[in-house]
Amino acid sequence: MASAVLSSVPTTASRFALLQVDSGSGSDSEPGKGKGRNTGKSQTLGSKSTTNEKKREKRRKKKEQQQSEANELRNLAFKKIPQKSSHAVCNAQHDLPLSNPVQKDSREENWQEWRQRDEQLTSEMFEADLEKALLLSKLEYEEHKKEYEDAENTSTQSKVMNKKDKRKNHQGKDRPLTVSLKDFHSEDHISKKTEELSSSQTLSHDGGFFNRLEDDVHKILIREKRREQLTEYNGTDNCTAHEHNQEVVLKDGRIERLKLELERKDAEIQKLKNVITQWEAKYKEVKARNAQLLKMLQEGEMKDKAEILLQVDESQSIKNELTIQVTSLHAALEQERSKVKVLQAELAKYQGGRKGKRNSESDQCR
């Protein structure tokens, strides 16, 4: 298929494609110059020329294969591309006269420069063509914007009317509605008009690659829109018949979902209840432990208090005993004091009586 497409579609070659890259030996081009040279030099030149020819043939074959692959890919991606066949380029290259071996070296040296320039020029041309194609597409869209908007509005209005009619009929009847022929033909007529207008404008412009590509893309988009419209109409016809069943299925699905949610919530509640019972048991255990600790602390405190009270009682009893002893000793001391006073008084009396006796005796003696 690819070869047939390549043979049928013309291809455009680069303006440097006709440069002679492959050439034969120097004996064919200039037979009279090599007669005066030595045999050894001719043999070395012949071997070098054969090796160069083989290398050039390989390069040429590789280039032809690459060009053919690129053309096949272009034909597969873009069905209509103006290109020339690679066979014509090859024939033109073979028809050119063969160059001298001295010129071959210079051409080989300059070939890379020529190729770079060719690539730059082709890239610049490609960018310019892209810009032109984009500008043309924008201009076409702006020119026919009103027509596109009118077509879209009519299609949307027809869709809305059909949906309303189908809803009304669905309320009274379950059978689906069909699209009217007038609406269908009107949409087909509008799409055909848009296609004709786009095709006429594209023919008026230059028949370049990118313009045709834009036309193909526009046509494909219109076809896809038409297909979508047809699928929507057919879908709306079938939807009215299946809406009731879908509602029933949705209700059943909702009921099942609610049941599943209830079961899941019941399981969660049961888990929470189990957790609560476990925590209650732990709380009771902790409470009992705390009560035991309180009792132990209270008992320890009571023991300490009882010991202190006993010590206080003992001290008080000792104090009482000591006070009693002190009082008794104080009373005995007072008694002793009184006795001493009495004795002192008696001594004083006794001494006074003895002095009076002495005085009387002294008087008597005198």
From Swiss-Prot:
Q: Which UniProt keywords apply?
A: Coiled coil, Golgi apparatus, Phosphoprotein
Places the protein is found: Golgi apparatus
Tell me where in this chain the PTM Phosphoserine is found.
Answer: 23, 25, 27, 106
Sections of the chain in a coiled coil? 47-77, 128-160, 243-353
Specify residue ranges for compositional bias: Polar residues: 39-50
UniProt-annotated stretches for the region Disordered: 20-110, 147-177
Which protein family is named in the record? Belongs to the GKAP1 family.
The entry's protein name is G kinase-anchoring protein 1
**Source taxonomy:** Eukaryota, Metazoa, Chordata, Craniata, Vertebrata
Which gene produces this protein? GKAP1
